[in-house]
Amino acid sequence: MIQGTTKTEAHYRAIIMDSSSSLKEFSTNRRKYHKRYILNEKVEEEDSKASVMGRLVETLLMEEHLFDKKFHMSIVTNAPTALMLDFVEALYKHTLAATDENGAISRTFEEIAIDAHKDSGFKIKLDAVLAKFIGSDAEVYYKEIREVRSKGLTVVTTDDVTQANRIVETLKTNDATAPIVNLVESDRFNIHNQLQIEGYTVLGHTFKSMMDKVVIDHKEKTIQVYDLKCTWSVENFYEEYYLYRRSYIQAYLYFEGAKQSFADLTDYTVLYPKFIVCDSTNYMRPLIYEMTDTSMDHAFSGFTHRGREYPGVKKIIKDLQWAIKNDTWDVSRENSIANSVVKIN
């Protein structure tokens, strides 16, 4: 049974329930998880250029009608780059930290700029940076992100949108991806874009998910989940994205979520999830990365790659349940059980 398909993305994200994103965050930074999901404190995320491009491509490809609800078109053609972008983002961060709930700012711009200059990495003096900043597109961009980020919008430029449209066109015409992204509703296929499901359980823990694309094939009697990723390195997706961002957690939860959400289709097979990976610069061809029996087993049980251990969903959920039950976030389950004594072998 499909649940939550009509909620807006904002309403979906407001649902207090773990997801693959929060589970990944717990596994990599439990302090941030504790602040965001237990204490309900606001944690600002720094968007990379690739992640913004990914959301743009996803929206233009699957939900173009929602563009204005997710993005704000900047009046500048090009956003600041390199150290100036770092300076602008640092300005925003320190401005936000100095702003109370009524919108009053407790620090002067000069004080905020001094801290932003330190964070940005600029080697030139602050006066020289401000000479480049004041009256420039960078200042306009700074004012825009201050205005719209509080509304849940992402600032993008016309160049960003043009590039995203090029990527969408590539996905629609590439031999590997076109048969997937161009699928439309028919007697044979049911297509669900940005499918929201909630309330499914894995190892007794309740989750929600928003799946980019789910295709139900009534002829083959299969259910296929797709997730779109936009990265700087399509060919090296496995190491530079899948492992780094622990996307195997997402793949496993999506698989389990799809099985439970479509349980009424008793004679249908839920296939392992696939990642559609496109190049955020639109140079390399998109590739499709498929989960296998081995990778799904690794996703659940954990695995080692090049000497580094990656915890599986089973362990991560067990650790999270322990932390919640004991309200203990400053030590791992294993080290607590060992009375904070760690043996070095």
Regions found by a protein language model. Give the residues of each.
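Single, functionally critical "micro-switch" positions that shape active/binding sites
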Residues: V57, M211, Y254
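Secondary-structure boundary elements
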Residues: E185-D187, V215-I223, K259-T269
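Non-catalytic protein-protein interaction segments used by genome-maintenance enzymes to assemble
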Residues: F189-H192, I197-Y248
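Short catalytic/ligand-binding loop motif for oxyanion handling, primarily in non-cytosolic enzymes
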Residues: K69-K70, V234-N236, Y283-R285
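Short regulatory "switch" loops immediately downstream of catalytic or recognition motifs
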Residues: E169-A178, I216-H218, E256-A263
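Metal-dependent nuclease catalytic cores that hydrolyze phosphodiester bonds in DNA/RNA
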Residues: M1-K208
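Metal-dependent nuclease catalytic regions and adjoining charged, substrate-binding loops involved
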Residues: K93-L96, D100-N102, S106, A113, ...
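Hydrophobic/aromatic-lined pockets within catalytic cores
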Residues: L61-L66, V215, C230-S233, K259-A263
